[in-house]
Amino acid sequence: MQREKFSSRLGFILISAGCAIGLGNVWRFPYIVGKYGGAAFVLIYLAFLLILGLPIMVMEFSVGRASKVSAALSFDRLEPKGTKWHWYKYGAMAGNYLLMMFYTTIAGWMVQYFIKMMTGEFEGKDTAAVAGVFSDMLAKPGTMTFFMIIVVVGCFAICGMGLQNGVEKITKVMMLLLLALMVILAARSVTLDGASEGLSFYLAPDFHKVVEYGLFDTIFAAMGQAFFTLSLGIGAIAIFGSYIDKSRSLTGEAVLVTLLDTFVALIAGLIIFPSCFAYGVDPGEGPSLIFITLPNVFNSMAGGRIWGALFFLFMIFAAASTVIAVFENILSFAIDLTGCSRKKAVIVNIVVVAVLSMPCVLGFNVWSGFMPFGKGSGVLDLEDFLVSNNLLPLGSLVYLLFCTSRYGWGWKNFMKEADTGEGLKFPKWAKFYVSYILPLIVLFIFVQGYISKFM
């Protein structure tokens, strides 16, 4: 069967960026930027993106393009005879399914909140009542299941239309609308009365905060965010390498994807901080920022119902772009491994992903007694921990060693693939760094993740 290809370079870059751009860009990045010293932190973060995230992304793209298949078969095709690199296919597949087991539920929340904003449900509510809307939503497994299934069916339906006609065409429109919405929301936020304080908190370099939190903590926060923001290690990015030709070198393409991801994260901060400071609200981070803090801010704002609806529309696009990208990977696993049609893979996986997403839905209500990491934790935290703290760093380590070790695909093969085509070349002098130092950094992130979680 002839492998499908992207119809344009723009489609490839926007879809790869859509996979990388996730909810963490909005609910985590701005918060840690403000906490660790604004622009001072951003500079450290950008340095780590360059030396940590970028090389691994180039390696994922290279493995995908050279093998022309998903992570379900890419190691089988490229590994030296008699080696066992292909065992990691199970880790990659598990990572994609695990990520969707909670992401579909959160994407469903975004759809619910968009409707709530549009219908004016928050108007006239005080802070406690707005928080009550969120806890009421979590207490209703039936409603959450309904919206989760809408996300699963809707995003798989787009994938079912094919790579060019479905995934590429629709994600391109979504990503361009996402970027336009962000610019409009940021322009509104920075022109609010009192927004300047939020801007200086976010962007003014504050080296005192770097000292206050400790240089090590600041560097580790920057390192972790740079590593996790690009969703590397589970083959979610590699799949898009398998859909492109060899006309462009892969380092240049990875730089563009990384820049887009960074642009979205930085602009998210321009939406959140000026508006929170303008209304005297502590931004915080995580789901409470999106579902409690910001609805309160929109409540206080002239035309807040419209701005709130636009914000949640942007969040739907951010979540859906990731879901569609990962669903495309999940479908390609099925197609590559079984040779089944795209349509059959879609039908089977709609059922599989919907069923696998149920523990996350039930973890907030029926199964709320299950607290894997102590009080306040739930099923979602366990699923997130398995992906973020385990499969992403360990998978990245596999890609690194596979592309640099003579027992794997090897440095020469990797460099030949990465540098084929016009554009920026992968630096030859980086061989020692990516072969010996970068694997140690990734291992450090893995170990440190356990230390900060359990100690």
Question: For the regions a protein language model found, what residue spans apply to each?
Answer:
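Select transmembrane alpha-helical segments in multipass membrane proteins
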Residues: K5-S16, F41-I44, T83-Y97, T145-V151, ...
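Hydrophobic alpha-helical segments of multi-pass membrane transport proteins
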Residues: A320-A325, V346-F364, D381-K416
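Membrane-interface "cap" regions at the ends of multi-pass membrane proteins
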Residues: M1-W27, I56-F61, R65-Y90, D245-S249, ...
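A generic transmembrane alpha-helix motif of multi-pass inner-membrane proteins
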Residues: G378-L401, G423-M455
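Membrane-embedded translocation segments of transport machinery
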Residues: Q2-F6, E168, K172-A320, I324, ...
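Transmembrane helix-boundary motif of multi-pass solute transporters/channels
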Residues: L10-F48, G235-G241, G252-V255, L259-L260
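Inter-helical loop and helix-membrane interface segments of multi-pass membrane transporters/permeases
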Residues: R3-E4, I32-Y36, A66-G91, T104-Q164, ...
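Loop-to-transmembrane helix boundary motifs in multi-pass membrane proteins
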Residues: K5, G11-I13, C19, P141, ...
